[in-house]
């Protein structure tokens, strides 16, 4: 973005390396080398993007100064209920005091309120693709909320960077496989947000 200046790229296990070592398509010059989070001068930062495993963004959120806005891609600030978070992700939430200062951000529906919150919690891939068409339908009472069935597809990159045999290209090419049917983690945030819109309990 022309109005964004990248001051730090952080990945504690890859400190000292250049980002294009991991992604050759990144051709932008003058990007900083990867550094450790502990070496960041927060006084120079306005916005922090985090793309970390669930549970890790909470640790960062606890230490950054109040003036730094956090845009988080994990599930750490998507769910309002801490018991629901623990049920689906298996860990206790460490930043309960920050939940009220976060917003579940599908821009098409939350744009007017993004400036009000410190933490912008980005939804998962499935919830985004599902809610963008469903929310207008629910608002206009065009679907029955007690019988919503969803059949969604995504690319394998959503499974993370760790190499798994079943996610190797030769095993995926021209094929499709089901996973998380009836128990996908993203169900919790979809239920939460659609319930708000429907003003009655929604279970997908």
Task: Annotate each predicted stretch with a short phrase.
Residues 181-204:
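Oxyanion-binding "anion nests"
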Residues 1-181:
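N-terminal Rossmann-like NAD(P) cofactor-binding subdomain of oxidoreductases
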